[in-house]
Amino acid sequence: MVKIISDSTCDLSQELLRKYEIDILPLHILLGDKEYEDGKNITPDQIYAWSDANKTTPKTSAPALADAMELFRPYAEAGREIVCFSISAGMSTSGNVMRLAAEELGASDRIKVIDSANLSTGIGLLVVEAAIMAKNNRTASQIVSEIEKLKPNVRASFVVDTLTYLYRGGRCNAVAAMAGGVLKLHPRIVVEDGAMNASKKYRGKIASVVMNYVKDMEKDLKKARPERVFITHSGCEQETVEKVRAYLKELDIFDEILETRAGGVVSSHCGPGTLSILYIAK
């Protein structure tokens, strides 16, 4: 059976990783001179505390080549095919590290690397689809072919509570960040062609903003594939998350409504209170 591996930015829960037998290759997070592995020895809340204390965003970096080789080696030596997923190439060199690891192991013919052109559970949606195909005994080439067809149909967007973290990370300018704070503006960010672009702006308290964001998606949600939808957040009030879940359930579109918490890398750039709705369009 083909082994499915993703970098840590897919933001899948431990439960889903176990269910679909997915392995994770962590990106690295630098808090000053201390280096951590995303999802292993650092939490988003620790990152927020450090970022607020230091008034800067942590640096993040691609997985270490040695770690990628160590993760791939037992499967390669057993002759198994591997399909790997990386965050958008425009955001990290994670995919390049995976390809280099495959070359170093002399297994480039059996290890396929997919640039998700996405982030968070926008990647996770594709990873789960690949894992289901693997369980159905599809080959690596077949999985890659099907996933490449699905990639343009992934819909990933999120609404942020504060522009501070995007500003610290160079994703928006100081004027926009200041105006956002004063006017209580919350932009909707959409992932398109592997990059993040701002679209609609909402005003008000984040709890009502989140619901308006979700309700604005209703027309598009009705064109979604029914298998699953992700609610991924970086530390929202649980009451808000439950209201979103109830709304999606009432639409009666999806077989599964899956809640996940954004990992360290994604959280370090978007900040607390961010909520995303992610699905695959028909």
Where is each model-derived feature located?
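Mixed-charge interfacial surface used for oligomerization/domain docking
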Residues: 3, 9-23, 28, 34, ...
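Class I S-adenosyl-L-methionine
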Residues: 35-106
